[in-house]
Amino acid sequence: SILQYRDTVQRHFVASMATAETTAEHREKILSDFYLYQQKAIEAGKDDDERTFILPNVRDRAATHRLATLMAEHGVEVKQASESFRACGERYKAGAFIIDTAQPRGLFAKTTFTQQVDMDKTFVAEQERRRANKLRDQIYDVTGWSLPLMFNVDTESCDDAVKVKGEMISADMPLQSEMVNADAKVAYLVPWGDMSAGRFLTAALRAGIQVKSADQAFKMESGSYPAGTLIVEVAQNDKTLAEKISRIATETGARVVGVDTSWVVEGPSFGSENTAGMSAPKIAIAWDEPTSSLSAGSLRFVIERQFNYPVTAIRTGNMSWANLSDYQVIILPSGNYARHLGTGGAENLKDWVSKGGVLITIANATQWAASENVGLLDVKREYALKDDDVTAQDDSDVIEGTTIENREGFLNAIENEQELPDYVAGILTRVEVDQEHWLTAGVNPEVVAMVTGNDIYSPIKLGSGK
């Protein structure tokens, strides 16, 4: 029989009502179990080797603040220290966040903060057996999920309770800005390297403020500033600049340092060729089929909600003929674009890129851009690297016979000459960052990234990019 849309709605309604009725009938048992679960969490936390998690809140204030308030949003008790303190032999400054796992939500905190949770050895052995037999693994989702690692936030643990004065934070606690010399005579500097600086930049550009970015690190009497630091010169903006800077700093939580001199002790000066002017780009994103809703939705959420910057959604099919000259950046989320864009779409995007457009491709979209028919990227997708030479397939109708002595020999005989690498089911991996590239301005030398899939590309040649 044909399943109608109304049938799915009805069944969803029936299932929801049945769940609600069952919960109501057994409410005492459910509430009792929930209470005991939280009580168990308190006792487990007291004896845990990682009883307390500490977020020093020294590097990347914005990410640390976001992680702390996210935990508070999920009911975790998070304290912010109001004074410096010592814990397990280490000293921490005021402002550090503390999570004691001896609390009702302690098991949740433990699960999301523990950096290494080994999979069951028997399960791992079974997956390796399946892989050796050319079968897919049974891993349902990602294998790494430590929130501090995913946020690239420094976190330390202590096997004891931490006694320090402080206050429990709320989910809506704002990130406090740091404003030095609000009435600067020459310029305002915003050190690059966290989300608050990024939000400051988007807000400043939307407010019509003239902003520069330093391609290299530099030093002044007021301190050292990393590559990517934003420079807002007083002389290049109107008389309301100080008021705008103060307002944007408060809204974004950014750290802003006003300076009364342009004298640079070391590094490029404000007027050198190593300080580039920033412009407010118009951004478009491919929408609807064939884009992945998860990929497109998450990208748009980050730009529009976390950076408060507008994005125009364009139906993918329209990119084959639409005039793209109004946009400086186009994002292609993960998706299979060959059929929907076709030759016309590829040529339209190629022409747009040749005129200075910036094309950003995600996951499967990169496969499309790097394909031979499109050629937007001078890279090739790689096959798996074989440990041993695999005999090429003979296309003759009849071939010489071979002796297969054991199962290993049989598996080798049926192995494809070329096949894609094994699929990675979501791992957290440490990435070494090229500190000489302009895209990495303000980024730490090492970051943690989520890796999933089996796409491996050849390195891009210097003549085509870096």
What are these regions (language model features)?
Residues S1-K466:
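Intrinsic-disorder/low-complexity accessory segments
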